[in-house]
Amino acid sequence: MNKGRVTQIMGPVVDVKFDGGKLPEIYNALTVKQSNENGELNLTFEVALHLGDDTVRTVAMSSTDGLVRGTEVEDTGKAISVPVGDATLGRVFNVLGDAIDLDGEVPADVRRDPIHRQAPAFEELSTKVEILETGIKVVDLLAPYIKGGKIGLFGGAGVGKTVLIQELINNIAQEHGGISVFAGVGERTREGNDLYHEMSDSGVIKKTAMVFGQMNEPPGARQRVALTGLTMAEYFRDEQGQDVLLFIDNIFRFTQAGSEVSALLGRMPSAVGYQPTLATEMGQLQERITSTNKGSITSIQAVYVPADDYTDPAPATTFAHLDATTNLERRLTQMGIYPAVDPLASTSRALSPEIVGEEHYEVARQVQQTLQRYKELQDIIAILGMDELSEEDKLVVHRARRIQFFLSQNFHVAEQFTGQKGSYVPVKDTVRGFKEILEGKYDDLPEDAFRLVGGIEEVIENAKKMMA
């Protein structure tokens, strides 16, 4: 066993000296196991740099409290590896692949894969484009998701990114029976706990593996936990040929953890204090998320936008990798429209007649045109009032408000807050509903009948109740 000693500790970054010139390779895992007066010290480091002088600089995967200079460190000879396969379903893990739920250890004979690996080769990639139906009207109509694509959920604090992710996990498991992997990267422990219990109650947990590196953990764990989740998802794709969903909440925290470690590793900061390797790190993660000839990983990533500034290097770098974006807008939450997805800012490269079909494409574009015209008229309405509009514009406003409310919907995962049952709406019903609104079939129904409903049939029922 190759052994070294700790020579310097700078918070989560630790230098280790190996005698005899036998240095561990970059990304190798080093371990410390010893007892001290505070109890057991059980640490894992990952080698990040070779400094010369027989010394390596490493990043700790858990807190370095109680670690002292001179402590003996062992080189495991391989990268951090985590359990994969069916044994991971229904379980909760940390960055190292240790089970952190109360269901005992993972059996020793379960296969473990290293978290660092190459992206699939060019010839293995699949080229066919298929739509993933989510059952959420605003998403399916205006910014549809692609199987094997990468989707960004953008929004500031408290506009509903995590709730939307929970609803997607629920819908995909219930309607498609698909496997999901959830990576909680640097988010609140309470939210992870709530998600776990909600998924246990609804039975979705049996189809899900969960990995957490939360806000209270050192940056090493937060930076690597996304790779842990991805490794588990890759096994289901490559070995079992599954279509897997990988949820990352929140991809910004992955970048944030990298920037915390970067300065301590001695790298020069770049724009806004981020790490100079920002684009490389993001690329290494994102390029592994793809469709191959065997199966696909569709990734849905919540992206926190610092101070709602989309030009910040972290969200801007993430944008480059995405196939679709779902933008959440605070203004819509204030109007009571949930999910608060901005129908004009959200985009998808799948929204083209070749992929979604001519009718869907036409309806989606007409919906966007109507909403855009309404947005342009809002200034006139604010200054002069509705009466000053032409008859044609009055009709646009009339229909746009109904469309805006019909884009809202009740979620299964929000039943305990709203007291109303959630709804899953197939794409063809969504397209039909909006087409009929645009044609003016429901111009006589009250606006409020369109709020927080599923299909157009629910609108008609609501209207009957209101008029009764």
UniProtKB/Swiss-Prot annotation:
Subcellular location(s) of the protein: Cell membrane
This enzyme's EC code(s): 7.1.2.2
UniProt keyword terms in alphabetical order: ATP synthesis, ATP-binding, Cell membrane, CF(1), Hydrogen ion transport, Ion transport, Membrane, Nucleotide-binding, Translocase, Transport
GO molecular function, one term: ATP hydrolysis activity
Membrane topology according to the record: Peripheral membrane protein
Binding site for ATP: G155, G156, A157, G158, V159, G160, K161, T162
InterPro entries linked: AAA+_ATPase, ATP-synt_VA_C, ATP_synth_F1_bsu, ATPase_a/bsu_AS, ATPase_alpha/beta_chains, ATPase_F1/V1/A1_a/bsu_N, ATPase_F1/V1/A1_a/bsu_N_sf, ATPase_F1/V1/A1_a/bsu_nucl-bd
Protein name, UniProt field: ATP synthase subunit beta
Organism: Bacillus cereus (strain AH187)
Underlying gene: atpD
